[in-house]
């Protein structure tokens, strides 16, 4: 991609970049010209093939000034004139003068940046000493020696694990000549990071191999790790570089506990077999304690889940309890796996694991549900019931169920504590919840005399000669008036007259 061009006003102002192709210049916002002596279409600038040319298209001419000459010359209209970087042109004789500037392309900019980086790297490498570059193979050889020593120790103690480690060591040895054959020289800051990464990788490789296993294999790996740290210290002290000493400190911090154990055993000059026995005993004790810790929370979890499931009786709530116990057991199992990795084999063989507990819990739920099955209320619609809600089927029985047609609600006996519905069997409410909460037994026959008389079974003690009682009583006086009253003829005539008067008034109002 070729570079572009820019126009720089001589009077000052922002540069104007020219797009590839033709651009019409004149009065307007592009060049910021407001003088009416300049036309809106004064000239055409064309960028093509990495070159710039101008063609005046207005009667007022444009002026050209080369970089060598100092005088503006008028251009002929409708003729192309090539402009080079450093040349100038103007739209008026003494005003609106623009200078041509070239913009380098992206490829050229990348090339210049690369060249400048190469020069900077060469200067830096010439100024810096060669010690870090020379120490690089020493560090790689030191790392290989450390890895070799760990390999020898592991082949003596654990031949099964040595096969995989030999493959890793061969891969590392294959990578070392590739690093040595590279001729590319890195900057100093990249070399520093590379050296620090290698120093950190030595203890990471030696420590990462001692992760899994139990019993004598772990003891042998610990001993091989101690041997590697001792040999590494000797070689790192002989090298005498600050970076190697930092790696020594890292390995020393990681193997601090194992060094203390090794020093106590070597000071007493005890045989390796006895030390291995003591270490294996301590590790077995740790494994047993971890297994006991794992058993306790599992048993507690089983008790809690069984207690929760026993309290739930409906099938819907039993499902919720089962899901809750599953979630709790899965969460507890994850936490136990994170706490101990060495006791995985024992915990897997343990009969009190979450899966067996869950199976027992489901069995107990099924047995409890069968034993405590409650007789449901018979649905009033019977075979014509259209409801499909499972809760409805839990509370009401239908034709085909074992408890359909019998006693509607368990507990409708003398021990039923539910309140009695005031309407009894004649209750018109059809809400099933109402029938569950209230009893609907036959109501006792009301005694009208008992309700009217306050003193039931007691003799009448009223004084019949009391004047107060005589005043309240009213004598019945028969009359000739009949209850079916019929209006007389006079009343009918009055009503007819009134209706006629009303109609006459309405007729007069219309006129």
UniProtKB/Swiss-Prot annotation:
Motif (NAP1L motif): 476-500
Zn finger residue spans: PBZ-type: 377-398, 419-440
UniProt name for this protein: Aprataxin and PNK-like factor
PANTHER family to which the protein is assigned, alphabetical: APRATAXIN AND PNK-LIKE FACTOR, APRATAXIN AND PNK-LIKE FACTOR-RELATED
Short motif (KBM): ranges: 182-191
Region (Flexible linker): 406-416
Lineage, broadest ranks: Eukaryota, Metazoa, Chordata, Craniata, Vertebrata
Effect after changing residue 427 to A: Abolishes poly(ADP-ribose)-binding and poly-ADP-ribosylation by PARP1. Abolishes poly(ADP-ribose)-binding and poly-ADP-ribosylation by PARP1. Does not affect histone chaperone activity
Organism name: Homo sapiens (Human)
Family: Belongs to the APLF family.
Originating gene: APLF
Comp. bias intervals (Low complexity): 345-355
Record CDD domains: FHA_APLF
Domain remark in the UniProt entry: The PBZ-type zinc fingers (also named CYR) mediate non-covalent poly-ADP-ribose-binding. Specifically recognizes branched poly-ADP-ribose chains generated by PARP2. Poly-ADP-ribose-binding is dependent on the presence of zinc and promotes its recruitment to DNA damage sites. The KBM (Ku-binding motif) mediates interaction with XRCC5/Ku80 and XRCC6/Ku70 and recruitment to DNA damage sites.
């Amino acid at each position: 991609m070729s570079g572009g061009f820019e126009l720089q006003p001589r009077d000052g102002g922002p540069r104007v970049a020219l797009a590839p192709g033709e651009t019409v210049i004149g009065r307007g916002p592009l060049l910021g010209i407001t003088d009416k002596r300049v036309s809106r279409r004064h000239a055409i600038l064309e960028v093509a093939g990495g070159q710039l040319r101008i063609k005046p298209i207005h009667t007022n001419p444009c002026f050209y000034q080369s970089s060598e000459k100092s005088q503006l010359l008028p251009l002929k209209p409708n003729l192309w004139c090539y402009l080079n970087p450093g040349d100038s042109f103007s739209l008026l004789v003494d005003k609106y003068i623009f200078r041509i500037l070239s913009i380098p392309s992206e490829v050229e900019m990348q090339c210049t940046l690369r060249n400048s980086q190469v020069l900077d790297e060469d200067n830096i490498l010439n100024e810096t000493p060669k010690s870090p570059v020379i120490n690089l193979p020493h560090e790689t050889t030191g790392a290989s020696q450390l890895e070799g020593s760990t390999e020898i120790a592991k082949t003596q103690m654990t031949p099964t694990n040595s096969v995989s480690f030999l493959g890793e060591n061969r891969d590392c040895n294959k990578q070392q000549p590739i690093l040595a054959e590279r001729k590319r020289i890195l900057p100093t800051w990249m070399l520093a990071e590379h050296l620090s990464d290698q120093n950190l990788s030595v203890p990471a490789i030696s420590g990462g191999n001692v992760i899994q296993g139990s019993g004598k294999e772990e003891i042998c790996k610990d001993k091989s790790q101690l041997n590697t740290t001792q040999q590494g210290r000797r070689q790192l002290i002989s090298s005498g570089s600050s970076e190697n000493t930092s790696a020594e400190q890292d390995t020393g911090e990681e193997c601090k506990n194992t060094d203390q154990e090794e020093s106590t055993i070597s000071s007493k000059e005890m045989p390796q077999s006895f030390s291995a026995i003591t270490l294996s005993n301590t590790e077995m004790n740790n494994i047993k304690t971890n297994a006991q810790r794992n058993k306790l929370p599992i048993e507690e979890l089983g008790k809690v889940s069984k207690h929760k499931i026993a309290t739930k009786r409906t099938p819907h709530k039993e499902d919720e309890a089962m899901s809750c116990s599953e979630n709790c057991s899965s969460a507890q199992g994850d936490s136990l796996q994170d706490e101990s990795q060495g006791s995985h084999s024992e915990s897997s063989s343990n009969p009190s694991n979450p899966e067996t507990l869950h199976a027992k819990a489901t069995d107990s739920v099924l047995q409890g549900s069968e034993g405590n099955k409650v007789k449901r209320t018979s649905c009033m619609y019977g075979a014509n019931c259209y409801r499909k809600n499972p809760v409805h089927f839990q509370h009401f029985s239908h034709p085909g169920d074992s408890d359909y047609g019998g006693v509607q609600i368990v507990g409708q006996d003398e021990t039923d504590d539910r309140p009695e519905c005031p309407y009894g069997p004649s209750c018109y409410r059809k809400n099933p919840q109402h029938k569950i909460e209230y009893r609907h037994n036959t109501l006792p026959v009301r005694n009208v005399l008992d309700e009217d008389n306050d003193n039931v079974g007691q003799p009448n003690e009223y004084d019949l000669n009391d004047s107060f009682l005589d005043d309240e009583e009213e004598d019945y006086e028969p009359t000739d008036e009949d209850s079916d009253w019929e209006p007389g003829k006079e009343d009918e005539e009055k009503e007819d007259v009134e209706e006629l008067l009303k109609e006459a008034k309405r007729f007069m109002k219309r006129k």
